[in-house]
Amino acid sequence: MAVSVSIVGASGYAGQEVLDRVLAHPELELLALGSDSLAGEPAAALDLRLDGQLPPFVPNTIALAAGADVVFACLPHERAASLDPPHDSILVDLSGAHRLADRALYPTWYGFEHPRPDSLAAWSYGLPELFPPAGRLIANPGCYATAALLALAPVAGFLDPRSVVVDAKSGVSGAGREPKASSHAGFVLENLAPYRVGTHQHAPEIRGALGFPVCLVPHLLPVRRGLVATCYARPTEDGLRGRLEEAYAGSAVVRLLPQGVTPELGRVQQTDAAEVALFEDRATGHAIVVCALDNLGKGAAGQAVQNANLALGLEPTLGLRLAGVPV
């Protein structure tokens, strides 16, 4: 019997990407498509290719309460923080509303007081290769946090924690579908700009997983999708590659590249895979760990479906895109 799915906030980029994977999944069946802005409209209002294939959009509250086995919440952070999880459903939240266990961090990093702070302890952080989800309430990691943690978490005990810098660059889809000046073509094209320097909300998420803070500097790339995080740190002992090999041995999603091979944006775009590589800086002896992934794939929707698969006891890669199409 198929597993029923509701998507809350299906009209945004993350929601669209989740929908695409649900439709390709052999065990999942769409029950409700939620969007407050498109409620009552046919699915073709989102994408003409969906004309006549799917149920019409309903308000997000109806999609949430539709009784689906799995709910994917693709809402802005503050709206997702107010969600009342349906009983017995697996709920995967793609926002940052439940990634931080400490309620005191939300005003500083997200700009709001958490409306349901007592519920935070019930959520598990789901980065499958490193922190498999436990329970039915799953906080899907952020895109920068995913890349940084895939690069750093396996070797965190081998690094000087005061030395870690994450230099990350992402495509404009990471800013969401709603138009804004910083994602306008006139600003983005032929440009490379750092943003939220020292204040990005994924920094405390990374700290919570690693146990120490990192200097995170995100940049906006003039591409639609994809993310590369280059992580620099002073190693305290040898054996970093062995730790990475152990972490990703047998993984169908995260590929540790051969020595000397660099991760590339083009190989991970439109996929749910990630590439990781380790280098040594000849001049300083610093370790350099690079991770490339698609911010909408492994950095959002692909990881959400992977988390749902694990929570359902299914093969983790069902419904995922694990190979790009060369051009």
Which stretches of residues belong to each language-model region?
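N-terminal Rossmann-like NAD(P) cofactor-binding subdomain of oxidoreductases
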Residues: 2-188, 193-195, 280-283, 318, ...
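Short glycine-rich or small-residue beta-strand-to-loop segments that form or flank ligand, phosphate
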Residues: 4-7, 138-139, 230-232, 289-292
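Conserved active-site and cofactor/substrate-binding residues in soluble primary-metabolism enzymes
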Residues: 13, 122, 143-150, 197-205, ...
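Alpha-helical scaffold segments in soluble metabolic enzymes
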Residues: 17, 21, 150, 154, ...
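Residues in well-ordered beta-strands of folded domains
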Residues: 34, 128, 167, 217, ...
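Contiguous C-terminal substrate-recognition/catalytic subdomains in enzyme active sites
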Residues: 182-276
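C-terminal active-site/capping subdomain that shapes the small-molecule cofactor and substrate pocket
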Residues: 232-327
